[in-house]
Amino acid sequence: MEVMNLIEQPIKVTEWQQTYTYDSGIHSGANTCVPSLSSKGLIEEDEACGRQYTLKKTTTYTQSVPPGQGDLEYQMSTTARAKRVREAMCPGVTGEDSSLLLTTQVEGQTTNLQRLAEPSQLLKSAIVHLINYQDDAELATRALPELTKLLNDEDPVVVTKAAMIVNQLSKKEASRRALMGSPQLVAAVVRTMQNTSDLDTARCTTSILHNLSHHREGLLAIFKSGGIPALVRMLSSPVESVLFYAITTLHNLLLYQEGAKMAVRLADGLQKMVPLLNKNNPKFLAITTDCLQLLAYGNQESKLIILANGGPQALVQIMRNYSYEKLLWTTSRVLKVLSVCPSNKPAIVEAGGMQALGKHLTSNSPRLVQNCLWTLRNLSDVATKQEGLESVLKILVNQLSVDDVNVLTCATGTLSNLTCNNSKNKTLVTQNSGVEALIHAILRAGDKDDITEPAVCALRHLTSRHPEAEMAQNSVRLNYGIPAIVKLLNQPNQWPLVKATIGLIRNLALCPANHAPLQEAAVIPRLVQLLVKAHQDAQRHVAAGTQQPYTDGVRMEEIVEGCTGALHILARDPMNRMEIFRLNTIPLFVQLLYSSVENIQRVAAGVLCELAQDKEAADAIDAEGASAPLMELLHSRNEGTATYAAAVLFRISEDKNPDYRKRVSVELTNSLFKHDPAAWEAAQSMIPMNEPYADDMDATYRPMYSSDVPMDPLEMHMDMDGDYPIDTYSDGLRPPYATADHMLA
């Protein structure tokens, strides 16, 4: 019997768009049909592969044929045997309609007899399927050597017909398993696919590998046969069905075959995949983008290749133009991975990535919303100057009302960055109840520093240097935020949170109405306690001659500067001045005048300038020997430091004898005010005490601290984003949860 007659007519493939599951078929084992990549229709493979061809050559297999019989006779006897088994076990079963019962039936109703007969009919059907399965396996096994030989034939017509036959065999489970067990045949299919220029042959061979890739044994056979470079080559095919088969097969390999990712990278698979993002079939794009995510995750070189081939722009376009949830989710996963790459981040933002991601923050898909939030969080430190983020900011403020930890972490972090040195964004968030929402988030966060610390930083930004800053300062008090904020100064809170809280308290103190609530919350003793502890730690390292290390990413000198600066602003209130003086802080402030850190010298001179308004404090300052370091600071390059020093010297000299006052006056005039008479008047009236700190008067360090970010528990290939630095003491950026995606690669 001819080889072609060993198989039945092909079974029509279920349309892929209706039955597509995200495993590309490997879990269900269901074969799929090729979608149109242009969304214009389907190519029915049955039209190409459903015709039968007669081959003039047969092969005899002596090892499995009874002595004295030819292959044809043995096949006939096997067929007859199967027929006899059917007739013996299931009499009357002869074809597709054999399951119908010969009984009278009222149209639209099932008779009692039919219902009683259902179990026996099911048993009969199962037996028939079992017989057919065995037949398929036996026939495919006997045909494999001949088909392998035909695939290697020099005649392209013969090769095409052989590929069609193997394709039909690969659609049935029994024969497909037989094909997977033949490395020679799989290698022949791969070789044929790689070398052919015939479109029908290319379609059939890619279809074969696609069907085999539904099983782990098939994936291994494809991988060992060098199928990955051949499949990557097929990504350049003009035939849409070939593209579909190639990308889904590669997707299954990337998911489940060890070593496939490296093989795809070495075959320049990324360079071929990124241009496919310009196709317009959503389900094809979903598989393509997931391939990109699998390849880019944990591999910096892959991220740069995607960038070089225009990937960020194409991905942002998908987020902007499509509504298919699975595509949006897979695309957001790629952007999430790319958002921790310093080179990709600006490209995504410049392509409109912030706005495109913001569109989906109100989606009904929690997994899509979460990916968009993480990506926005990671991109936000390079998006502080972006326009058109009004709707994103409003949504982020609304997201602060939810209880999900990941949502709160992302929303607070993004708001912290987007309000950094951006007066427009600060005003918008303040006007949309952002202060109230942030305070409530802090109250609900408990001990979760990943939420509390960026929320405090955002409040710090909102309470300074924009038209609504005073409104924000008052809003913190009116929403009962001051007691909760002051409590954050307590140890054992992490130093980054303590540092951010100190900065917020300094800004709140700029509002006179906040002085009494701050004093009632015992903020001054806590600040002094932190100041003493931090200064002692810093001095120990100075005495030992060692460089001061970071504690949780914060240097103790930053805490010294922050506490002193906050006390400087609080000292504007007479009651606060008295409390600060009674805590015996003047010796420490005088000692800080000798600091090698210019910013610490400035804030120390500033707080002494405030305290010197009271005669008792001025005398104490003079008694501590402050005149000498203050005279030195008159020559400081920092104009603010010199002005504060002059004001203190002028105040403590008021009760001195005329000769001393004259000497101080001459020194002040010669060193500081020689060319600026107005500055002398300013020092006399201590004008600087009425002005808030400007940005350039804050510290410029940008330390880091580690924070584990929850993994994305979706699918078996997850990505995790890792550490992020806190912002500066003033308005500072919070770079992304950066380079930890290698941890799960």
From Swiss-Prot:
GO molecular function: alpha-catenin binding; cadherin binding; cytoskeletal protein-membrane anchor activity; nuclear receptor binding; protein homodimerization activity; protein phosphatase binding; transcription coactivator activity
Segments of this protein annotated with the region Interaction with DSC1 and DSG1: 132-297
Organism: Bos taurus (Bovine)
Keyword tags: Acetylation, Cell adhesion, Cell junction, Cell membrane, Cytoplasm, Cytoskeleton, Glycoprotein, Membrane, Nucleus, Phosphoprotein, Repeat
Protein name per its UniProtKB record: Junction plakoglobin
Membrane protein topology class: Peripheral membrane protein
Segments of this protein annotated with the region Interaction with DSC1: 574-661
Gene3D superfamilies the UniProt entry points to: Leucine-rich Repeat Variant
Localization of this protein: Cell junction, Adherens junction; Cell junction, Desmosome; Cytoplasm, Cytoskeleton; Cell membrane
Modified residues (N-acetylmethionine): M1
Domain remarks: The entire ARM repeats region mediates binding to CDH1/E-cadherin. The N-terminus and first three ARM repeats are sufficient for binding to DSG1. The N-terminus and first ARM repeat are sufficient for association with CTNNA1. DSC1 association requires both ends of the ARM repeat region.
Source superkingdom: Eukaryota
SUPFAM superfamilies: ARM repeat
Assembly behavior: Homodimer. Component of an E-cadherin/catenin adhesion complex composed of at least E-cadherin/CDH1 and gamma-catenin/JUP, and possibly alpha-catenin/CTNNA1; the complex is located to adherens junctions. The stable association of CTNNA1 is controversial as CTNNA1 was shown not to bind to F-actin when assembled in the complex. Interacts with MUC1. Interacts with CAV1. Interacts with PTPRJ. Interacts with DSG1. Interacts with DSC1 and DSC2. Interacts with PKP2. Interacts with PKP3 (via N-terminus); the interaction is required for PKP3 localization to desmosome cell-cell junctions.
Purpose of the protein: Common junctional plaque protein. The membrane-associated plaques are architectural elements in an important strategic position to influence the arrangement and function of both the cytoskeleton and the cells within the tissue. The presence of plakoglobin in both the desmosomes and in the intermediate junctions suggests that it plays a central role in the structure and function of submembranous plaques. Acts as a substrate for VE-PTP and is required by it to stimulate VE-cadherin function in endothelial cells.
Name of the encoding gene: JUP
Residue positions with a glycan: T14
